[in-house]
Each structure stands twice: as structure tokens, then as C-alpha cells.
UniProtKB/Swiss-Prot annotation:
One of the record's GO cellular component terms: cytoplasm
Protein origin, superkingdom: Bacteria
Reactions the enzyme catalyzes: ATP + H2O + a folded polypeptide = ADP + phosphate + an unfolded polypeptide
Recorded name of the encoding gene: groEL
Record-listed E.C. numbers: 5.6.1.7
Gene Ontology BP term (one): protein refolding
Protein name: Chaperonin GroEL
Organism of provenance: Rickettsia akari (strain Hartford)
């Protein structure tokens, strides 16, 4: 067992805050319409250029263990914001740093950290309620485009394309982003389906940055029962390996030896595979698997028809242009199903909807209908170079996530204005003691920081602008950092999704509270010894075979 380094009190927190500063300083430069790019070296290929806060945060690892602990805590605020709301990662980082730094100063001055935390929690809850009250639902294409434009750093084309995609497949529809083979940026609607089942093991992941399994031109095996032993499947697996194409397995469950064997072969490179549970339950599960079979021109392997896995040929497998499997969802894009068969299936479901008297059954049938007939909108992002395409694709993905958040919880005035004006409502909060009051004061000051940072990235004095804005009672009155003018932010179309602003604050406060209430830090002691394992060399022979 490795020896441990133990630090206590303000010394431990100060070193953690040094790590927080390193990460926050790298991330904060990306905030706002005039935020700068960050260039990140990659282990292979061209460097990555990004203005996405969470991408910058994820790339940072510090040598000093204690400083790194602080940086990793701050990174978790950005990552959580990205997972829940899809955006607001830089705002979360800036807020968390401000809250943690001010909180630590007060703890060092003798304030009780638990009461500071209670005061901060009271303030954050009050601001969250204020955000909910201020939010405005969005309905029009123009408003959807505005959110997409702001979240993609002022790129109007991205905002307009996202609005168009939502118009094509509906606000709840499936929209994916992929790289185009040319310079253009287009929206294409293809046959596709998404269902809420993710991979059964993270070892199926092919893109570790996004934690998804991406299968190009895969075969799709649909099996009605549980898979616990792969022995009956050997002939079909061998045929798939010979074809050099990936395989998606959809079954009631894949467990035990079967799952372990698939994982081993995936890791050894013998078979590019992903396994997911079938969507739905009982009879509904069987119906949904039949929908997938029709969509992909495959067969549902079911014992009701006397079918056995050992007798299945590759002709019984469905196919699609692409499948993406995340932790929670599976998206099948452009299945090979016959258009006439899909239309017949749609008509069959429509007649079932007309006949059913159960509201629940009707709702579930309508979900199936939407999955079969809605299609998937694909945003195809092009550019002059690979670096440019990847950078723009990142911005499109951010903007899409932010737009979904806006549709879900509405929008508020952007540019840090909502947080700034919400801070003014906190002076009326009732508390039990001066330490809790100090916790509220920490939040009031921290809420000014995102707006200050946006202004400073635009080359102006943030403190002066904040002072001028606080003289006004209008909650929508703010500073347009793009045109350097004081405007009504809502009328100017400078809006943020309420969910993004709310999540950024809650995640930042959560991390800051952990830091100020930490008294002891235990990390592995740095070792001077070199790694005992020699570096792996390229071209490991004999790794491509199957191992069943």
C-alpha cells in the first residue's frame, strides 16, 4: 500500500485553492462572446482548439497531488454542469472558484465553516427560486435560434441550423451531430430511432472523451431472451468477425459469461461490439424489438417462431448506417428497413391508437409511433481543416444541449445579468447568526464574477460595468459585450437557458461547500521511483483474433 501524505487546516485548503486557480485561470478566458480559444496538446494528431470550458477543464491534470485534488474538485463542477444542462461549464468554474476562495478567507479568519455553508445554501436556494420566477418559456423558431447562437459564441448559422433541425423533428426529436466530408454545414433528416437503454458495460465505449460506443455500418442482432452463454452464437459471431463490421446486440439482458466474453473480445480487438438491453417491458418490449427489426431489415430471434440462435445466419441480422450508444441511450441512424414495411407498421400502430381505451397504452403507442416515423435530424458540420471542423462540432454540440435546456425550463437574461440582479434579493434573507450572514455575503459577491469575467474578456473594466448595472432596477438591463453597449438583454436576444444558469450555480456551490468544510486532506505521497512496467510498444501482434 502506498504511503500517504496528510495535510490539515488552512494549509491544505490553500494548496487546494492553488490548484483551483490554475484550472479556473485556464477556463475563464473562454467566457463570453469575446472569450479566447485554448489550444490543447493531444497524445496523437493535431492539437485541439476549443472555447468549451469543460473540454479545457478535462484536459488539466497537475503534478502536485494536493493542488491536483483542488483542480479535480473544480473540474467536477464543470463536468456536472455539462452532464445536466449541457452548457454553463465556464460559469460554474468561475463561480466555484469565487465561492471557495472567499469562503476559505473567512474560515481562516475564525468563522464556522458549517454555518458559512448553511448561509451559502440559503442564498443559493433563494437565487434558484429567483431564476425560476424570471424564466420565460420559448416557443418561436427565432428564440430557439437565439439560444443556439449565444451558446455557440455568436455563430448565427449554428443557431439557425439547430432551430431548423428542431422544426423538422420536433423539440423532443432526436438530433445528432457529425462531421461532414466537405466545407458545408447542413441539416439532414434520416430514418432513425432512439430508445432509453445504454451499454451494459463501459468497456464497449469506443470514444472515451464522450463515453459513447460509435458503431459505423453495424450488424444488429435482436434476441428476445436473456443471453448468458455465447456458445449457441459462435457461428454468427464468427461470420460477423469475417465481415469486419461491428455488431450491436439487443436482448432482454446479456449477463455473466456472455457479457464477460464480449468485453474480452472487444478489448482484444477481435470483435467491435456493444450490447444493450431491449427497451420496454413484457409484451411492449417484444413490440418495440419488432419495430427495430422492421427499421433495420432484421429479424427478431424469438422462440415463439421456433427460431434458435445456433441456426441464425447473417441474413437475419439488421443493419444501419450508424449506431451511437451512450450510458443511457441508443440511437440507430438510417436503418436499412424497407420504406413500405415501415409505413405499414406505422399504419398498424395508428390503428391500435384509435382502438385503445387506455390513456397509458395510447401514450406508449404514440411514443413508438414517434420513434418509427419521426426520424433523426443530423447536423453535418464541415470546414477547411480537421482542427476547424472539430472545434466547430464541439460548439454545435454545446449549442444543441443549451437549446434543449432552454426548451425545457425557459430562458433568462444572459451575459451574467440574471445572477447579478438576483444577488440584490439576498439582502432580505433572515439568518440565525453572523456566520450564516457571512455565507450569504460570499454568494452576493461571487454572483458578480461571471459578468465581470465576460466584460474583462472583452477588454473593459468589469467592476465599473457591474456598478453601473446595479444602479438600475430593470432585471433585464445588461451589457452587450459583443457591441460594447448597455441594452435590454431579452430584447437584444442575449438570453441564457434558465436550466444552465441554475445548474452552474448549484454545482459551483456544492463544490465550494466541500472545499471550505474540508479540514484534512489525504493523498498518495509522491514517489521518486520510475514505473516498474516498461512502456508498451506499437504493433502488438496476435491481438486481432477471437477468444470465445
Amino acid at each position: 500500500m502506498a504511503t500517504k501524505l496528510i495535510k490539515h487546516g488552512s494549509k491544505a485548503r490553500e494548496q487546494m485553492l492553488e490548484g483551483i486557480d490554475v484550472l479556473a485561470d485556464a477556463v475563464k478566458v473562454t467566457l463570453g462572446p469575446k472569450g479566447r480559444n485554448v489550444l490543447i496538446e493531444q497524445s496523437f494528431g493535431s492539437p485541439k482548439i476549443t472555447k468549451d470550458g469543460v473540454t479545457v477543464a478535462k484536459s488539466i491534470e497537475l503534478k502536485d497531488k494536493i493542488r491536483n485534488a483542488g483542480a479535480q474538485l473544480l473540474k467536477s463542477a464543470a463536468t456536472k454542469a455539462a452532464e445536466v444542462a449541457g452548457d454553463g461549464t465556464t460559469t460554474a468554474t468561475v463561480l466555484a472558484r469565487a465561492l471557495a476562495r472567499e469562503g476559505n478567507k473567512l474560515v481562516a479568519a475564525g468563522y464556522n465553516p458549517m454555518d458559512l455553508k448553511r448561509g451559502m445554501d440559503l442564498a443559493v436556494n433563494a437565487v434558484v427560486e429567483e431564476i425560476k420566477k424570471s424564466s420565460k418559456k420559448i416557443n418561436s423558431q427565432e428564440e430557439i435560434a437565439q439560444v443556439g447562437t449565444i451558446s455557440s459564441n455568436g455563430d448565427k448559422e449554428i443557431g439557425e441550423k439547430i432551430a431548423k433541425a428542431m422544426e423538422e423533428v420536433g423539440k423532443e426529436g432526436v438530433i445528432t451531430v457529425e462531421e461532414a466530408k466537405n466545407f458545408s454545414f447542413d441539416v439532414e433528416v434520416v430514418k432513425g430511432m432512439m430508445f432509453d437503454r445504454g451499454y451494459l458495460s463501459p468497456y464497449f465505449v469506443t470514444n472515451s472523451e464522450k463515453m459513447v460506443a460509435e458503431l459505423e455500418n453495424p450488424f444488429i442482432l435482436l434476441f428476445e431472451k436473456k443471453l448468458s452463454n455465447l456458445q449457441p452464437m459462435l457461428p454468427i459471431l464468427e461470420a460477423v468477425v469475417q465481415s469486419q463490421r461491428p455488431l450491436l446486440i439487443i436482448a432482454e439482458d446479456v449477463e455473466g459469461e456472455a457479457l464477460a466474453t464480449l468485453v474480452v473480445n472487444r478489448l482484444r480487438g477481435g470483435l467491435k461490439v456493444a450490447a444493450v438491453k431491449a427497451p420496454g417491458f413484457g409484451d411492449r418490449r417484444k413490440a418495440m424489438m419488432e419495430d427495430i427489426a422492421i427499421l433495420t431489415k432484421g429479424e427478431l430471434i424469438t422462440e415463439d417462431l421456433g427460431m434458435k440462435l445456433e441456426n441464425v445466419s447473417i441474413k437475419s441480422l439488421g443493419t444501419a448506417k450508424r449506431v451511437t450508444v451512450s450510458k443511457e441511450n441508443t440511437v440507430i441512424v438510417d436503418g436499412s428497413g424497407d420504406k413500405k414495411n415501415i409505413e405499414d407498421r406505422v399504419l398498424q400502430i395508428k390503428s391500435q391508437i384509435a382502438e385503445t381505451t387506455s390513456d397509458y397504452d395510447k401514450e406508449k403507442l404514440q411514443e413508438r409511433l414517434a420513434k418509427l416515423s419521426g426520424g433523426v435530424a443530423v447536423l453535418k458540420v464541415g470546414g477547411a481543416t480537421e482542427v476547424e471542423v472539430k472545434e466547430r462540432k464541439d460548439r454545435v454540440e454545446d449549442a444543441l444541449a443549451a437549446t434543449r435546456a432552454a426548451v425545457e425550463e425557459g430562458v433568462v437574461a444572459g451575459g451574467g445579468v440574471t445572477l447579478l440582479h438576483a444577488s440584490q434579493t439576498l439582502t432580505k434573507l433572515k439568518v440565525e447568526n453572523k456566520d450564516q450572514q457571512a455565507g450569504i455575503e460570499i454568494v452576493i459577491e461571487a454572483l458578480k464574477d461571471p459578468l465581470k469575467q465576460i466584460i474583462e474578456n472583452a477588454g473593459e473594466n468589469g467592476g465599473v460595468v457591474v456598478g453601473k448595472l446595479l444602479e438600475h432596477n430593470d432585471k433585464n438591463y445588461g451589457f452587450n459585450a459583443q457591441d460594447m453597449q448597455y441594452v435590454d438583454m431579452i430584447k437584444a436576444g442575449i438570453i441564457d437557458p434558465a436550466k444552465v444558469v441554475r445548474t452552474a450555480l448549484q454545482d459551483a456551490a456544492s463544490v465550494a461547500s466541500l472545499i471550505i468544510t474540508t479540514e484534512t486532506l489525504i493523498v498518495d505521497e509522491p514517489s521518486d521511483k520510475e514505473d516498474a512496467m516498461p512502456p508498451m510498444r506499437g504493433g502488438m501482434g496476435g491481438m486481432g483474433g477471437m477468444d470465445f
